Amino acid sequence: MHKSPAKISPLFDPKFTPPYCPNTNCAAHHDSHRFEWFRHASYETRLGHVPRFRCRACGRTFSSSTFKPTYYMKRPYLLEPIARGLVAGSAQRQLARSLSCSHQTVSRLAARLGRHALLYQSRALAGQIRITEPVIYDDFETFAYSQDAALGVGTASGASSFFLYSIEATRHRGPGNLAKRGKPIDPDPFAHGYHNAVERTLDRLLPLVPQGASLTLITDGHPGYLRGVREHPGKERVEHRIFKNPNDRKKGQARSLEARLRDAAHFASDLCHKLIRHSLADHRRETIAHGKRHCGVMERIALFMVWRNFIKHRSERKPGETPAMRLGLTDKPLGWGALLAERLLPSRVPLSESWRHIFERNWVTPELGRNTLHRRVHAT
């Protein structure tokens, strides 16, 4: 039997008040003003006293733990240390050994954290955020399952705030003869489409640009990026600036002016990609901890996204301000306790089609054979 730590932060507040009815079919689910409830007994756990409630509108009962990200968890105290470890470079089996749990527990909670991160970022973008800075778009190249099926993760980073606004995936062929000999990639909504990823990113960013203003988009001029901007319905509102990647220079040769301009323009994006490769174990060079499922890779990058935006300081040399603080979303750096304080439901937070595809794990990795989908009724 697993024993809980000696000191556990209080998970159940005796003064807790339910904010809405968790029943998605109830009229009080979306309209909290119509929500009326009364206490409906309670139960005891080894972690404390848990009060229960009943909705007057639909009669559904629920508890205070229904509104926690640890809902339905037998060991809720594992969620925060696993979140910390995943963005600190720990692989899943290393975390399992450190926390005395199964590696499957770590995998399931990593997926839960990724879904929570997608909802958290979506809620932040649906708020009062407005993009008034240039946005740098570039692909972080990685892979899942095998290197002959490469995965490009398009990142949209704020040039001055370093805020990571969006991530979008693109599955494509990897380099080399192995990829050419392999079986063709099964068609999926994320395959062979750098331009599709750019269009999905613009769909997410353009509504955040103030009315009458344009979005300054900085790229390296990849043909897929050019096509994505050219074919987007809102291309008139996009000011596309191109800083091409310079040719490789010889050893000892000074950087050209073109290279210096490109590095200065892409600094925020390059830094983001370095942090991903440094902080996530599955993206290190020549690692045996590489991701197995494309959805799993995107879930962990989504967790990195909210950590980078709301928890990590914008600069290590000048700490004190996060990217979210620079945009006015928060007034102080958040901790994992604040980020995991509230359970978010997909029925109450708008998700784009591509992010919902990842949330529900509909993106199948055919090489694996069996892919577990996310089909929960009550838990997330």
List where the protein language model places each region:
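Residue-level recognition of single "structural anchor" positions
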Residues: 1-380
